[in-house]
Amino acid sequence: MPSTSAWVDTGLLVALFARDDPHHDSAVEFLKGAQRIEFHSLWLVVSEASYFLGAEGKEGLLKWLEKGPILFHEITVADLPDIRATLKRYQNLSPDFTDAALVTLAGALGIHAIATVDLRDFSAYRLPGGAAFERLWL
């Protein structure tokens, strides 16, 4: 049974499925040691990752996702005011909608760990109460 819940961001998926990515080997090793982690994400993250992947990487990513390694959360219209507030709060970082949605849902769901290559932004983003994200990889 998982002992930790963590968000999966775009960079981990790209690193896992793009063999030429500089973080590929590290991502594969991280995943091998992550059996006790319950992964969460958004379909927006998959969309972003697929933009950076070639045909083989997209195929591998989708086959892997079919096995159910990630729990996906939906964004609803009710989430939009909080996502807008997140975008405004971090406008100096120019966050995209995906990051803002992930940060917003992380606070709402109490999942504070993340696997990401985006060290700059996820070092700056804060959760309710001012806590930083716990980066589990890189």
Regions from the PLM with identified roles:
Residues 2-6, 17, 25-94, 104, ...:
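PIN-domain endoribonuclease scaffold, especially VapC-family toxins
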Residues 119:
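ATP/adenylate-binding site constellation spanning eukaryotic-like Ser/Thr protein kinases
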Residues 7, 116:
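Generic enzyme active-site microenvironment
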